Swiss-Prot record:
Probable 2-oxoglutarate-dependent dioxygenase that may be involved in glucosinolates biosynthesis. May play a role in the production of aliphatic glucosinolates. InterPro entries: DIOX_N (IPR026992), IPNS-like_FE2OG_OXY (IPR044861), IPNS-like_sf (IPR027443), Iron_ascorbate_oxido_reductase (IPR050231), Oxoglu/Fe-dep_dioxygenase_dom (IPR005123). Transmembrane segments: none annotated. Keywords: Dioxygenase, Iron, Metal-binding, Oxidoreductase. 2-oxoglutarate binds at R261. PROSITE patterns: FE2OG_OXY. One of its GO terms (molecular function) is dioxygenase activity. Fe cation binds at H194, D196, H251. Binds 1 Fe(2+) ion per subunit. It comes from the Eukaryota. Belongs to the iron/ascorbate-dependent oxidoreductase family. Its cofactor is Fe(2+). This is Probable 2-oxoglutarate-dependent dioxygenase AOP1.2.
Length: 321
């Protein structure tokens, strides 16, 4: 487990990459230009800030308002958001509270979610808002993953890879720390430092900052994406798939001030039964195979164990040769 109590440096501007160009199509010169920027940013930081104009001001406002309504529901109501999968469904710990929706890019799935919370009538407005937002983030995720696989010369696996994943949309609320705990670093932790276990994560924070990312030289930096952009981040499963060519960065949420923080996350996740294994094209004398093939659910179950929680790198502890 990584240390949470290292003072962060000053705010830092991660690379900003624009995905809004209408000519951004596979095979175009603009695509190749953006693809090179994506690879450089992920090699350097494991993440980057993405501007994507399909996430309009109006859509962002609607998502923010939907989250306020959802988290105002009584706890027993929110606890109806259940899942048999680890780290899915409703979660609550200290300052952190979260709701999870599988396949929120499919409207029927979001309707099922709101029907859990409002059994009599669902909530059409919230369903449509979350569905549209998830759809747009999925479009961005697919572009990023296609660019990554092209960059490493494994484009023959693109369709197989994209079809082997599904999406989890997570709505997150971080409560401000109590007034009498201003000097207590433990109570300021909205979310402990961790690497994400999935393929790609896309995060968007609303109005209140708090996200920090650890660089490869072990420095914590405050990340402050604009309200018009999102943070795209490599997860452990992508690191394993690429035989360690990219790294998944540690990140955490530190809460200061008196405002509640809301954020959203879209997580691309390997489907049940899919084996994560590096293609032969990424294994050679200079890059020997680092990880054993594994199934994502087994990895999550390991992460829930004491050994998984205390490991400096759960991925290496679980799957490294």
């Amino acid at each position: 487990m990584d240390s949470d109590f290292v003072p962060p440096s000053v705010s830092f501007q991660l690379p900003v990459i624009d995905f809004s160009d209408q000519n951004l199509k596979p095979g175009s010169s603009k695509w190749d230009e953006v693809k090179a920027d994506v690879l450089k940013a992920l090699e350097d930081y494991g993440c980057f800030e993405a501007f994507f104009d399909k996430l309009s001001v109006e859509l962002n406002r609607s998502v923010f308002e939907a989250m306020e309504d959802l988290f105002e529901l009584p706890i027993p109501t929110k606890q109806r958001n259940v899942s048999s999968k680890p780290f899915h469904g409703y979660l609550c710990h200290n300052l952190y509270e979260s709701l999870g929706i599988d396949d929120a890019n499919v409207l029927e799935k979001v309707n099922d979610f709101t029907q859990q919370l409002w059994p009599d009538h669902g909530n059409k407005s919230i369903s449509e808002t979350i569905h549209l937002f998830s759809e747009q983030l999925v479009e961005l995720d697919l572009m990023v993953r296609r660019m990554i696989m092209e960059s490493f010369g494994i484009e023959n696996y693109i369709d197989e890879h994209l079809n082997s994943t599904y999406y989890l949309t997570r709505l997150m609320k971080y409560t401000s720390p109590p007034d009498d705990d201003d000097d207590d670093e433990e109570t300021k932790l909205g979310l402990r430092s961790h690497t994400d276990k999935n393929i790609i994560t896309i995060l968007h924070q609303y109005q209140v900052d708090g996200l920090e990312v650890k660089t490869k030289d072990d420095k914590w930096i405050k990340v402050k994406p604009s309200q018009d952009s999102v943070l795209v981040m490599v997860g452990d499963s992508l690191c394993a798939l690429l035989n360690g060519r990219l790294h998944s960065p540690y990140h955490r949420v530190i809460m200061t001030g008196k405002k509640t923080r809301y954020s959203t996350g879209l997580f691309s996740i390997p489907k049940t039964g899919v084996i994560i294994d590096s293609p032969e094209e990424l294994v050679d004398k200079e890059h020997p195979r680092i990880f054993k093939p594994f199934e994502y659910t087994d990895f999550l179950h390991f992460f829930q164990t004491e050994a998984g929680r205390i490991a400096q790198s759960a991925l290496h502890a679980f799957a490294a040769f």
